[in-house]
A protein has these predicted regions:
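Conserved alpha-helical scaffold segments that buttress catalytic/binding sites
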Residues: 9-329
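Basic polycationic patches enriched in arginine
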Residues: 3-4
Length: 329
């Protein structure tokens, strides 16, 4: 090829590219071409938008950590996860067989508006704003924030779908009693059971490595059991237990061993690797997931962004499960 032709080809390639895809995207299903080190940091470079028209899936941040019992900092989780997600936005999303955004319209809805000085109003604010998204018939993937946020999210989803099967990846059961006034990330499951918004008999918690006062009849997979099982066995257990019941998928990053997720508020040794958990998630395509979240990323305690990268990858897998379910309709 002549030097002039090569130069023209390079010019044509560059002309086809854009930067700041989160603002310049012409289509909700268009591919991004931002380099990983530059551009506006929406989740996987999806368009920043509050317009829910023709949207399949909404990614939303809730920067709240006032319920943390140990190390705070999860309010910075949504930003960290978005930043980490830039590493794989330009490529076909492994291990899925299709470009997740070729047919699934995904937007980054930004963050939940909260009054940082009035925590008692936080659950109602989260629930109301989540309902706005869900009422537009969009699937909601939320980035936390501490695990308290899952309670109002469950309320919003259950208002549409009825009691849900909770599929929870976590080192903690989060079943501590409260009086409905406490702001505590360790009690959201107890509240959800009490409120009748989850079905304990269909719910399952994976990776548990701490004690709690009550399991409410929820199926537990302890950390030592998870270590002894294959990923295929774990996923089959989840699918068999939940069945075809509508489910909510919540992933506390402290489910992972601190070697793979040090950047979190309440790390617990003895957990699984990111590789094993991703293998489990990839096999959960049979779940009827109605909503999902990734929580408890506290980047101040992270090293080389390993926690944020793990969380962004978990979130990407959740989008992959959603895309596969849409394509199967």
């Amino acid at each position: 090829m002549k030097r002039r032709d090569t130069a023209n080809l390079k010019d044509a390639v560059m002309a086809s590219k854009t930067i700041d895809h989160a603002f310049t995207a012409q289509s909700l299903t268009s591919a991004a071409s931002d380099p990983t080190f530059a551009g506006a940091l929406s989740f996987m470079r999806r368009r920043f938008s509050k317009d829910l028209t023709d949207v399949d899936t909404v990614v939303w941040g809730i920067p709240f950590d006032a319920a943390a019992s140990n190390r705070p900092g999860a309010r910075f989780g949504p930003q960290a996860i978005r930043r980490a997600s830039a590493i794989f936005d330009n490529d076909p999303q492994y291990p899925f067989s299709r470009d997740l955004f070729a047919e699934m319209a995904v937007i980054d809805y930004g963050d939940c508006l909260l009054d940082y000085g009035n925590h008692q109003d936080t659950p109602g604010s989260i629930e109301a704003q989540a309902r706005t998204i869900l009422d537009a018939d969009a699937f909601l993937l939320t980035l936390g924030g501490d695990h308290f946020i899952t309670w109002p999210l469950l309320k919003a989803h259950a208002a549409l779908h009825g009691p849900l099967a909770l599929v929870q990846f976590d080192a903690h059961q989060d079943t501590w009693f409260d009086d409905n006034r406490r702001i505590d990330h360790g009690s959201f499951v107890a509240r959800a059971v009490r409120d009748g918004i989850i079905d304990p008999a269909r719910s399952i918690q994976v990776g548990i490595r701490t004690h709690a006062p009550d399991d409410f009849g929820i199926r537990l997979v302890h950390g030592y059991e998870l270590e002894e099982m294959t990923a295929a066995e774990v996923s089959r257990l989840i699918l068999d237990h939940v069945g075809g019941h509508p489910a909510y998928l919540t992933f506390d990053i402290d489910c992972l061993d601190p070697a793979f997720a040090p950047g979190t508020g309440t790390p617990v040794a003895g957990g699984p690797s990111s590789a094993k958990i991703l293998s489990v998630l990839h096999r959960l395509g049979g779940l009827d997931v109605r909503g999902a979240d990734v929580v408890e990323v506290a980047p101040a305690y992270d090293h080389a962004d390993v926690t944020a990268i793990a969380a962004a990858t978990v979130a990407m897998y959740m989008l992959g499960l959603r895309a596969e379910r849409l394509s199967a309709r």
